[in-house]
A protein has these predicted regions:
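Long terminal segments
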Residues: 2-52, 57-62, 66-68, 73-74, ...
């Protein structure tokens, strides 16, 4: 397990490129900046790069790169690439890639790829497949 975590950190240790401005510990992080670790935001956030670590937002999250870690949002999460880790949110999830980990949603999950792990939702699931080691099940 320790070897896998180290490998994931090496693979996903890339810079975050933030399109919108938001405050991180009193400073404004602009396009071209980078941060690794825990990020909290009260507004909508759009990231062209990847996320490594924990990310919390009260608004929508839009990510262009990969995510390795935990994402929590009270808004929508929109992602085209893959997610490795845990996703919790109260809004909709719209993903074009795959998820490796756990997904908890109070909103709709709209997915074109596969989920390897566990998916729990309180609302509708559209075009979602859950793959386990013992078989393949459509929700």
């Amino acid at each position: 397990m320790k070897k896998e975590n180290t490998l994931l950190r090496l693979i996903f240790a890339v810079a975050l490129l933030l399109i919108v401005n938001f405050n991180v510990m009193g400073d404004t992080l602009r396009k071209g900046g980078s941060i690794v670790g825990k990020i909290e935001s009260n507004g909508d956030v759009r990231i062209n790069g990847s996320i490594v670590g924990r990310f919390e937002s009260n608004g929508d999250i839009r990510v262009g790169g990969s995510i390795a870690g935990k994402i929590e949002s009270n808004g929508d999460i929109r992602k085209n690439g893959s997610i490795i880790g845990k996703v919790e949110q109260n809004g909709d999830i719209r993903l074009g890639g795959s998820i490796v980990g756990k997904v908890e949603s109070n909103g709709d999950i709209r997915k074109n790829g596969s989920i390897i792990g566990k998916a729990e939702q309180m609302s509708n699931v559209r075009r979602v497949a859950v793959m386990y080691f013992f078989g393949f099940f459509n929700l």
